[in-house]
């Protein structure tokens, strides 16, 4: 069957803090997402892109950070944060942290 988008499913509930991170691609976004998730008074879900040896990365796992960056840059995996508290303030709760401008 088709792959399900766990982040999208969790965001549909409306009361779950959701983040997609890739520490090797954007450490600052990772830290920000973890702090926000920890401070959220409700369920939080952090989905991390973490390549493994089975992915067949050229040069092995020594290149995992570059692989994470490539996955983000090409749009295979998006960095995002969904914070329901922002909606309470009249703001968009979904923040896309991936930079697709260079693609």
Segments from the language model and where they lie:
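Glycine/aspartate-rich loop-and-adjacent alpha/beta segment that forms the canonical ThDP
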Residues: 30-103
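Conserved thiamine diphosphate
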Residues: 1-40
């Amino acid at each position: 069957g088709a792959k399900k988008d766990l982040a999208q499913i969790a965001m549909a509930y409306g009361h779950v803090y959701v983040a997609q991170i890739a520490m090797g691609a954007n450490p600052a976004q990772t830290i920000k997402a973890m702090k926000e998730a920890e401070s959220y008074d409700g369920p939080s879900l952090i989905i991390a892109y973490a390549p493994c040896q089975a992915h067949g990365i050229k040069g092995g796992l020594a290149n995992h950070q570059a692989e994470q960056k490539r996955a983000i840059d090409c749009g295979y995996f998006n960095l995002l944060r969904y914070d329901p508290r922002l909606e309470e303030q009249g703001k968009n709760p979904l923040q896309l942290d991936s930079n697709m401008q260079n693609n």
